[in-house]
């Protein structure tokens, strides 16, 4: 995930997310390999970013950019529905809030997404310029409605990045396309429950795991194994 930042004391470039769940799983399984999540911090790199972290005293510059863009579009817009959405966004920006926080219906969101307002991207405003990279990652992920799920075993422990409420077959496809293509069931368990068992098999024998179908929305902090056949 690429996160643009302004006015914050953050390092530039790829940064490892220090994931307490991954640390727990590593300690339990002692795998050959650990694959953490890395996010990328881009100073003022709004166009390329998937999310934005910005200091409170810098946010007006971002919002004014969007307001100027709306003003130009309104000066030539003829469609009344387009004008209504743009005017709604402009009024919200005048309250010094990013467009991502504005309540919109699906059609409005689709239009605004295509229009390219920067603050429509998941935007977090921070009072403290010395915020940590991990805190930025967590806050922007929460605003963006994305999450991690995990796979764990002796070979590898890994964090996987997906949209919140991603279904089981989508998570399987993240791991490998063959797992999605031959998906049968996913066996899932919360991180907390897995930590009370010896391993995944032991957790299953204790009734701590759940077998779910491909359409099941996978909760946050879930560890899973995919049953498949290709």
Where are these regions (language model features)?
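C-terminal-of-GTPase-core extension/linker across diverse P-loop GTPases
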Residues: 1-10, 76-230
């Amino acid at each position: 995930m690429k996160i643009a930042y302004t006015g914050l004391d953050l390092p530039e470039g790829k940064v490892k997310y220090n994931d307490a769940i991954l640390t727990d799983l590593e300690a339990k399984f002692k795998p050959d390999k650990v694959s953490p999540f890395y996010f990328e911090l881009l100073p003022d790199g709004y166009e390329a970013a998937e999310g934005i972290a910005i200091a409170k005293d810098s946010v007006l510059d971002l919002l004014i950019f969007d307001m100027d863009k709306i003003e130009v579009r309104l000066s030539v817009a003829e469609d009344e529905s387009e004008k209504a959405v743009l005017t709604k966004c402009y009024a919200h920006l005048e309250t010094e809030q990013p467009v991502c926080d504005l309540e919109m219906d699906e059609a409005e969101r689709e239009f605004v997404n295509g229009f390219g307002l920067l603050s429509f991207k998941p935007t977090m405003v921070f009072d403290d310029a010395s915020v940590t990279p991990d805190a930025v990652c967590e806050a922007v992920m929460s605003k963006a409605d994305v999450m991690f799920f995990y796979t764990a075993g002796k070979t590898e422990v890994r964090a996987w990045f997906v949209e919140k409420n991603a279904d089981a077959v989508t998570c399987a496809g993240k791991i490998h396309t063959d797992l999605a293509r031959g998906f049968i069931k996913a066996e899932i368990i919360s991180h907390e429950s897995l930590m009370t068992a010896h391993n995944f098999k032991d957790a299953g024998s204790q009734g701590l795991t759940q077998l779910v179908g491909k359409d099941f929305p996978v909760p946050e902090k879930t560890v899973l194994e995919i049953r498949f056949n290709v």
